[in-house]
Each structure stands twice: as C-alpha cells, then as structure tokens.
Amino acid sequence: MGKRDRVDRDKKKSKKRQYEEEEEDEDDIPGNESQEAVPSAAGKQVDESSTKVDEYGAKDYRQQMPLKGDHTSRPLWVAPDGHIFLEAFSPVYKYAQDFLVAIAEPVCRPTHVHEYKLTAYSLYAAVSVGLQTSDITEYLRKLSKTGVPDGIIQFIKLCTVSYGKVKLVLKHNRYFVESSHPDVIQHLLQDPVIRECRLRNAEGEATELITETFTSKSAISKTAAEGSGGPSTSQGVDAQATSDIPKDLFDFYEQMDKDEEEEEETQTVSFEVKQEMIEELQKRCICLEYPLLAEYDFRNDTLNPDINIDLKPTAVLRPYQEKSLRKMFGNGRARSGVIVLPCGAGKSLVGVTAACTVRKRCLVLGNSAVSVEQWKAQFKMWSTIDDSQICRFTSDAKDKPIGCSVAISTYSMLGHTTKRSWEAERVMEWLKTQEWGLMILDEVHTIPARMFRRVLTIVQAHCKLGLTATLVREDDKIVDLNFLIGPKLYEANWMELQNNGYIAKVQCAEVWCPMSPEFYREYVAIKTKKRILLYTMNPNKFRACQFLIKFHERRNDKIIVFADNVFALKEYAIRLNKPYIYGPTSQGERMQILQNFKHNPKINTIFISKVGDTSFDLPEANVLIQISSHGGSRRQEAQRLGRVLRAKKGMVAEEYNAFFYSLVSQDTQEMAYSTKRQRFLVDQGYSFKVITKLAGMEEEELAFSTKEEQQQLLQKVLAATDLDAEEEVVAGEFGSRSGQASRRCGTMSSLSGADDTVYMEYHSSRSKASSKHVHPLFKRFRK
C-alpha cells in the first residue's frame, strides 16, 4: 500500500511540474534557433575548483593571492574565480571603474567596495570596442593588489582569441569581411563555405584582397558635452594623491587618457562577399569561432540618402551620455550593441543623438503605443526634424509613410502574424522594402529571442542600438542579446549618477502591513490563487496606501500607485476616487489622464497597472506606491523605481527628493517575493528601509476602520473568481499566456453555460385567441 501511495505522489508531482512548465512564458521555452547563434566559447566559465572554502562558506584566498609591496596604492583584487573587487574610495577609482565596466559585468556596487565578474560575454564586449588581449591582461596586472592568477589569464586568452577580430562592414553599399589580422582572413578563406560566399568577377575568379589604412576618429563631437549644466563626473587624480601612486600605474593612467583622445591609424585586410549569402556567412563564422562584428560605415553609404536631421543647440549631452555614444561611434563607424542607462537618465536623448549622427533612415521600436507617442515627442524636442518626416505605425495611429525619414512602431505590430487590415498591410510592405540605416530598440530586455528574430527577418537595418535600464531577465536569456543585437557597449553606475544630481535621490522603503485576523484565517485555509487577492486586498494595506496618499498630497507631491492585479487596482482606485489606467483603457483616455496628472494641480494621484511599467514618461512623479507586483521580478522592481528617478527641478541634491514604497502583507508569500525583487536595486547600491508602523496613521480617518467594513470587503474578495486573482495580461505583450489554459474552481452550472441564467416562474393571462380552439376536456381542468 505504501508503494502505491509513493507512486501516486510521484505522479502528482510530475503533473504539477508539467503544469508549471506550461505556465512558463513563451520566451522561456528553449528553442534551437537561440543556440545556433552562440559560439561555444561563450558558454565557458572560470574554473572555480581550486578555490578553498571554509566551514562557513567563505572563500579563503590568502594562500593563492599574496599582496604586492605597494598594494595600498592599487585599487583591485582579482580572485581566482573571476570575481574582481574595486575600492570605490581609491583616488584612481574613476580610471579603474571605466576599465572594469569595459571588461566585466557589474555584480554589486554598494558605497565602498564594488564587485565585478569576468564572463565570456563581457570579454567579447571588451574586444569589440577595441581592447586587445594583451591590453586586458597588462592593465589587470598593473591595477591589481596581488598577482593575477594564471587561470584568469588563460580564461581571458581563451575568450578573446577570436572575438572581435573579424568585422562585417557595409561600405559603398557593398559588404566586406574585414580584419586587422591578415592571418585570420587567410584562415577563413580556407573554409569552402566562406570561399563560396566570396564575391567573384565576370570571369568567375575571386576578387582580390583589399588592404587599406584608415584613421579611427570618433563620430561624436567633444563639444557636445561641454557646458553640460550639471555637476561633473570627472574624478581625476588630484595632486595630493599622485605621490601615493606607483610610477608604472601613473604612466598607465596617462596612456589611457591619450588612447581616448588620439586618432589611431589601423591597417586592415578585407574581401568582398555576396549580399544574398550574408546570413549563411554569419552562421559559418560562428561555427569557426570567429563571430562577425557588424559595423556600418555610414559616412561612405552613398546609396541610402542622408536625412535632414541634426541636434538642436539646446540639446546638451551629459558626460555619461557622451561616453556611451563614444563606445558606439568610437572608430568613425556605427557599432551595433546595447547601452544600459538608469530610467530617467536620458536614454531617449542618446537614441536621438545616434540617429542625428548616422543621418540615415531610422526605425524606432517601443513596447506600447504610449512609448511611440513619447519617442515622437523626444525627436521633436531634441532634433531639428520636421513633423512630416516622422511616421507612426500603431493600432491607433497609422501615418502615411510618404517622405518619411523616422518611423516609430511597436514590437507587437511588426511581430504580428495574424491577418492585418488593408492599410496596415500597405505600411508593413513599405517597412519591409526600406533599407534602414539605424534601428533603435527601446526596452530591449523585454524581447524574447524568437520574437526578436521575427522582427529581424521583417525589417533590415545596418546598425542596431538597444536601450535598456535593466539588463536582467529571470530566465537568464538576456545573453541572447549579445549575438542578436551586439555586445553591451556601456553601463552606467546608478549611485554615481544619483550623487552627481543626474537622477533623483530616492528613499526606498518596505512597509509591513499586518494581515487582519479574518483575512489571515481565510489566507491559511485557501490553497487557490485567491490567496493573492487576500494579501493584496488586506484592509491594513489599503489603509496604509490611503494614509501615504493623503500624507504626500498635503506636500503637493505627484503620486503613482502600481498594481499588477486589475481587481485590486479598480477596488483601490474607485474607493479612493482616483483615475486609473489598465489594459483596456483607450489610448485617448490614457493620454488625457496622463496630461491631467502632469499639468492639473487637482490630479495628484493616479493608479496604473503593469502597462505603466515601461515607457511611461512622467517626470513630475516623485512618489511611487506599489500594492501588488509580478512575483519576484527584479526587472519590474527596477523599472517601477525608474518612474520616479528623473531628476527633480529645484530640489537639493543632498536630500531625498523621491520616495518608493512597497506595501507588503506580513506573514504571506508576498514577503519572500519582495526580498527577491529587491536584489537588483540592492546590487546597484540602494538600501531599503523597513517600516513596521507609519507614524500618525491613528489620527487619520481611513477606510475599513470597523470590523463590519472589513467583513464586507472579505465577502467581496471571497465572491471573486480565481480569474480575478490573476495578473493582467497586456495586449501585445511578449510571452503573454492568453492562448494557454488556466486552472480555476468551477461548478457544473458553469460548465453547462448557466452562470448568468436565472430560473423564474410566473403566470400570464391567456389571450382569447389562444383559447379559441381548446378541447372541452381541457377546459374542465382550467383554473
């Protein structure tokens, strides 16, 4: 009997696992296509087997990492497992940080010591922006307090031996495979597939190798960042600190400055390839461990006409924006890749500046119709482009593309596979036939690999620029972007920007709300998704939310309240008499609510569902209250914080000028989710203050203050269906589960379609016409 019970339990577990796998997002499902575009070296990791671990799990490096004599003057520790630790209080911190951002992934950046990690992808990004293997190892040795472990040197050589050495360049509308290493070109040409891709002349002979010398000069003018009107990020080495710096390290810093400013002559060897075989060529180069790095020589592109667009004189780049663009245009060509900047730090201006630099047709893709409108406004604000040259393509706005230079659309519009309207088909045909110089991909972290491939096959662009604030995904598929778009070109430090006044100084707080006894009793008893509704609709959480809204409205603050659950969103907003936006809200109503929020002093609070997580530009907002969220998503937490990160006018930089409250019901699953969600922001240097009691809450007149009101709310929650407990599914959102089945409790009447059917009996007087031909027998029994 025990064996049978065990088998039954195993069956139930396997069914549960199967159900949970079916609940995964579409982009979580592994696909063959995402693997074929990743070189095998990219999956390699640093060997950590030699690291000793004590009984408490701490790593002991004392025997492996002997200190140098002048270690106090050097800012880095390089551990054998690939982790690098940087002293943020070092006088040469700025130079060391710039170098580490180029070669490693930031892991954690609190106030005093920052942690980075060497990965295959970060080293791929390093060589793609011009760093050589010898440069990386030499710089690490000079900056490190200890000797660099041999395993780290071998790992760097393994990952950089082939990455970034071969480029696919578009010049004069012809494609060339180019490299500054002639031996690599000869190695590639020995492969029969690549020889087949090589262009041949009329006699059938392969075209000759082309050797040329070009000067790498930045396409971004240095004057763009002068007079930036804000605090300088420069933290150069002061005169007092130079005496403590070893001579070899000081010479290295001076050389780094010269390398950034000097023009460099590079000799390259290239051969021309057939345009129709580009995709086959790229796949073959990846198999040979020489992935092609795409570069666009836009200055020599004569086939695609220049568009009439320039930056306005009022558009002034901040130092970090200029630095990110220098990574993109560092050698006079446009590199494809991803730029990571915090929300509110001016990603849109970076995109507009890139479009003004390339000066070719530009396609911008966002993730909602609101973001399309905001991108159009950003182009008109920062550039000289005429309104008639901007074309929008959304479900609501389909501008005529005649004479269009900048097209703005959404991922869902381009990736749409079902039947379109006649007008939409015409616009799609026009998008497909255009040769785009630049494609700007906003909120690029949200795009699953398969969806993005679909977009790539529809439109062709010479250069792709991805913009995001959070290069993280819970499914670890963010690495796919390295080969679908390009390497990470630049990532800013959130705390540095905050301390310099470029983004708001935010006080993050987690407010613990005790569950009322009645709600907690039901929470423990119920095992369905309705548990989510119970801890979201907790009366004490509602009262805390109402108190915070009243408190900040008295200070004339602008408040956004976020809720992933639509049932809770409506209940809170209607009870508090506040406007709310969610999926079905029309585009016109959304814009009206947002405009009122920005300019109407009487509208200081709005409620928004998950549709507002990204691409909602609300610079006036300085308070955010979160009442429900998407599980333990780190990305969503950072995106929501970004709604209040924009620098506030007239605020003192030393004081907190924005507030982020996350309301959590105590002793529920929500507390575990909250801890997971905060990981990304804590790694960026933010700290969360835990508030167990809001001072002054007892004096306020708040809703649900009596047991009767709380009992009525509980009955309303219990009467809701499991479908009400689910999160909102946003139309057009990638990975949505709208096409999948969902489990919920039901009754036999529901299954028969009788949910809204009422059985009623009533008497009606018979008309004379109906009783005219009645048999006498039945007349006798009539009442």
UniProtKB/Swiss-Prot annotation:
Residues 1-52 are annotated as: Disordered. It comes from the Eukaryota. The keyword DNA-binding applies. It catalyses: Couples ATP hydrolysis with the unwinding of duplex DNA by translocating in the 3'-5' direction; ATP + H2O = ADP + phosphate + H(+). Phosphorylation on Ser-752 by CK2 controls the 5'-excision activity of ERCC1-XPF endonuclease; phosphorylated protein inhibits the excision activity and thus NER. Dephosphorylation reactivates the 5'-excision step. Phosphorylation has no effect on transcription or the 3'-5' helicase activity. Phosphorylation on Ser-752 by CK2 controls the 5'-excision activity of ERCC1-XPF endonuclease; phosphorylated protein inhibits the excision activity and thus NER. ATPase activity is stimulated by TFIIH subunit p52 (GTF2H4). DNA translocase activity by this subunit in TFIIH is stimulated by XPA, ERCC5/XPG and XFP plus ERCC1. Pfam families: ERCC3_RAD25_C (PF16203), Helicase_C_3 (PF13625), ResIII (PF04851). A motif (DEVH box) lies at residues 442-445. GO terms for biological process: apoptotic process; DNA topological change; hair cell differentiation; positive regulation of apoptotic process; protein localization; regulation of mitotic cell cycle phase transition; response to oxidative stress; transcription by RNA polymerase II. ATP binds at residues 341-348. One of its GO terms (cellular component) is transcription factor TFIID complex. A motif (Nuclear localization signal) lies at residues 6-18. Belongs to the helicase family. RAD25/XPB subfamily. Component of the 7-subunit TFIIH core complex composed of XPB/ERCC3, XPD/ERCC2, GTF2H1, GTF2H2, GTF2H3, GTF2H4 and GTF2H5, which is active in NER. The core complex associates with the 3-subunit CDK-activating kinase (CAK) module composed of CCNH/cyclin H, CDK7 and MNAT1 to form the 10-subunit holoenzyme (holo-TFIIH) active in transcription. Interacts with PUF60. Interacts with ATF7IP. Interacts with KAT2A; leading to KAT2A recruitment to promoters and acetylation of histones. This is General transcription and DNA repair factor IIH helicase/translocase subunit XPB. It comes from Mus musculus. The gene is Ercc3.
